[in-house]
From Swiss-Prot:
Top-tier EC class: transferase
Biased composition (Polar residues): 7-16
Entry EC number(s): 2.1.1.181
Region (Disordered): 1-25
Catalytic activity: adenosine(1618) in 23S rRNA + S-adenosyl-L-methionine = N(6)-methyladenosine(1618) in 23S rRNA + S-adenosyl-L-homocysteine + H(+)
A GO CC term assigned to this protein in UniProt: cytoplasm
Record GO biological process: rRNA base methylation
Protein name: Ribosomal RNA large subunit methyltransferase F
Family to which this protein belongs: Belongs to the methyltransferase superfamily. METTL16/RlmF family.
Gene designation per UniProt: rlmF
GO molecular function: 23S rRNA (adenine(1618)-N(6))-methyltransferase activity
Amino acid sequence: MAPFFSAMTSKKQSQGLPKGPHPDNAHRDGYDFSALVASHPPLKPFVRANAYGNLSIDFALPEAVKALNCALLKHHYGISRWDIPKGFLCPPIPGRVDYLHHLEDLLRQTPGTDGLPLLDIGTGANGIYALLAASRFGRAVVATDIAKASLTNVATILKANPGLEKRISLRFQSNPRHILTGVTQTNEQFAACVCNPPFHASAAEAALGTNRKLEGLAKSRGQRHISGPGKPQTLNFGGQDAELWCDGGERSFLLRLIDESARLPDLCVWFTTLVSKSDNLRPCKRRLEQRGASEIKVIEMQQGQKITRILAWRFESVT
């Protein structure tokens, strides 16, 4: 039997207008920098009026973006202490919480998911999905990663926020070729998994991507970005190897996740992942059909000019 496929869209989107963030996203209307500075004074030195007279920060400065994240997490989510080591991925909070809002909409429509934990695949040193799921939605979360340094940093964050330490558990994936296998337990079940796959196929490709983003930011400020030997490629999103690339890139990772989910069909009520490259949707849908998925959904999200998608699927229970 062919899987049931649906694309979750809004009336606003169907009319060709920008969809924008989820209606419940606290950051839908931008940032209240005055309130954020009051909650986190270290943000103040980075805040200034932009060309339009609005308060903002320079998003090309890693220190500024990290201070903004600290303020957002403290002001909106009660996470009093958050930090990442230099060079690790600094995630955009509005986009990350948008994923979780859409996921919670899906879970509310799905019987049998109340009280089940989430599985955060590749939590990274920032642990952002686990932290937001626990603080904003009250979910228990199992967070996994292939990098011990990332898990060590998340453990430090949890110790600084005792309320979250009780809801989030960390697991090391010892085999980097595995995603679900070996890091989950027999008869364990999750409401859903969340995942932000590595985007690039190699370290060189990741470096080129960073340079393009640097040039884009410089252009938006009317400046010229100079690259080459001796020019450090730093940017607020940073990222270590495991956070930015894997062999075969995003498509290869997604297909491996689909294959493993088919071997563990009852592990999650819904398997979900971000898909950054729209060209990867078709091969993923084809693989899901081949692996016997009973339902497939694509949920579109928009943050500014950037459009991403959540791919969600499930299998008929075999228990």
